A protein has these predicted regions:
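Short, aromatic- and cysteine-enriched interfacial helices/patches
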Residues: 4, 15-20, 91
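Acidic, low-complexity, intrinsically disordered interaction modules
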Residues: 16-21, 26-73
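Mixed-charge, Lys/Arg-enriched low-complexity segments
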Residues: 61-92
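N-terminal trafficking/processing presequences and adjacent post-cleavage segments
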Residues: 1-9
Length: 92
């Protein structure tokens, strides 16, 4: 979890936007799959994902997911990889 926070802090902005990407990244939590629109580091140093639920059914409202210790390690690693790829695109 701390590695994600440091990665976003080093990026400088604290906010990554995926809204206009043709292929938005997805992440799974508790049997649900979410399409990510943005990743934000909040003022209290927590990471929050904003997106929509796409599995098992599509939900027509924004979800705000706080990334904490309740997430599986594989999902946290996946989020970290998404952030790293986006940062690499920005500074390439």
């Amino acid at each position: 979890m701390e590695s994600i926070i440091k990665l976003i802090e080093n990026e400088g902005g604290g906010f990554l936007d995926f809204f206009f990407h043709k292929s938005k990244p997805t992440v799974q939590k508790d049997g649900y799959k979410y399409e990510i629109f943005s990743i934000e580091l909040t003022e209290d140093r927590t990471v929050e994902l904003t997106g929509v639920q796409v599995y098992p059914y599509y939900e027509h409202k924004l979800c705000h997911l706080k990334v904490d210790n309740t997430w599986r390690k594989t999902s946290i690693n996946h989020i970290q990889n998404i952030i790293q790829k986006e940062i690499d695109k920005i500074y390439k």
